[in-house]
């Protein structure tokens, strides 16, 4: 293999050379942990390797060794700890090079370090920040963690932060890096960079699912005034039909009483076995037999009809919850049933 080609090896080619260098026994044990597709791709690369000089083999083995060590350091104490150890052992430039490749392959998200911090620590930092900064940080955190923080913000700020998470699309790496840098100083952690999709309605739904019912109501009521369409879209996604499995038996029975049989039939037609089992367990035996018989002879159904039927059932679930007749489990353990 020409020297010029060696300097431009791809990750797949390096993996192939590493397997060859490790020998048959070790390579065979590695293969046991790969998928069929990965084995096929790797074998194809190995078959294309002609000759590699010892120096290049040693460089690839050393590179693999350094990355493996770095990954171990990350699992022990995060990127910050890994960076400190590698810089001390290998120097700043080499450590940075290794971590850049590793974080790229691991797809480390921005603010990954913040997931290890207590919600109170993050709250102390962000509560005086602009709502857009709060939204950016919360959109990257674990939903339960973000929900706890959102619950503690001033009520007049909560809805605005939730709205900004919902309408957030892409954020430039420069802004992410700057916010991370400041947060790093406060929490003694590290940052990563790249354009990353964040925010959106799904993100705010996950966050709101992590707050208590009172906080959720306050935020949604405020959003109803600011942006009714957005509030309605968020409500639709707060509880989906499949979430019926999280309700207790009494709640499911109450829902069944209010829904139209045709809507329930359509919804169950394409539902998972888990959903069907839980719903059937809360019906009379005669009703179950009737439903199963009708489902068996029901022809193909349009996805749009199913989604509309499930949406109507979800609306009933939310109305029953708002009326206090059923309870939907929330994050934070604040839903007390007496």
From Swiss-Prot:
Keywords: Bacterial flagellum, Cell membrane, Chemotaxis, Flagellar rotation, Membrane. One of its GO terms (cellular component) is bacterial-type flagellum basal body. One of its GO terms (molecular function) is cytoskeletal motor activity. NCBIfam families: fliG. Belongs to the FliG family. One of the proteins that forms a switch complex that is proposed to be located at the base of the basal body. This complex interacts with chemotaxis proteins (such as CheY) in addition to contacting components of the motor that determine the direction of flagellar rotation. This is Flagellar motor switch protein FliG.
């Amino acid at each position: 293999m020409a020297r010029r080609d060696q300097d431009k090896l791809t990750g797949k080619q390096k993996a192939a050379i590493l397997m060859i260098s490790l020998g048959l026994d070790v390579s065979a044990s590695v293969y046991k942990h790969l998928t069929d597709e990965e084995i096929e791709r790797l074998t194809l690369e190995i078959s294309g390797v002609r000759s590699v000089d010892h120096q290049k083999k040693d460089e690839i083995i050393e590179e693999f060794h350094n990355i493996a060590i770095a990954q171990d350091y990350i699992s022990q104490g995060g990127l910050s700890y890994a960076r400190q150890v590698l810089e001390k052992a290998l120097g700043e430039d080499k450590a940075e090079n290794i971590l850049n490749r590793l974080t790229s392959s691991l797809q480390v998200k921005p603010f990954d370090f913040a997931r290890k911090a207590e919600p109170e620590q993050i709250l102390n930092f962000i509560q005086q920040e602009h709502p857009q900064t709060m939204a950016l940080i919360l959109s990257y955190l674990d939903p339960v963690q973000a929900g706890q923080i959102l619950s503690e913000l001033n009520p007049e700020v909560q809805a605005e932060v939730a709205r900004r998470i919902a309408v957030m699309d892409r954020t430039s790496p420069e802004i992410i890096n700057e916010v991370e840098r400041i947060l790093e100083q406060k929490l003694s952690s590290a940052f990563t960079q790249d354009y990353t999709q964040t925010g959106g309605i799904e993100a705010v739904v996950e966050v709101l699912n992590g707050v208590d019912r009172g906080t959720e109501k306050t935020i949604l009521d405020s959003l109803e005034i600011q942006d009714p369409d957005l509030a309605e879209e968020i409500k639709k996604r707060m509880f989906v039909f499949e979430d019926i499995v999280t309700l207790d038996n009494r709640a499911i029975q109450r829902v069944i009483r209010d829904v139209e049989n045709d809507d329930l039939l359509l919804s169950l037609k394409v539902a998972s076995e888990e959903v069907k089992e839980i719903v059937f367990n809360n019906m009379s035996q005669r009703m179950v037999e009737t439903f199963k018989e009708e489902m068996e002879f029901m022809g193909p159904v349009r996805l749009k009809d199913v989604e509309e039927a499930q949406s109507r059932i979800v609306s009933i679930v939310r109305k029953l919850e708002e009326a206090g007749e059923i309870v939907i489990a929330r994050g934070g353990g604040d839903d007390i049933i007496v």
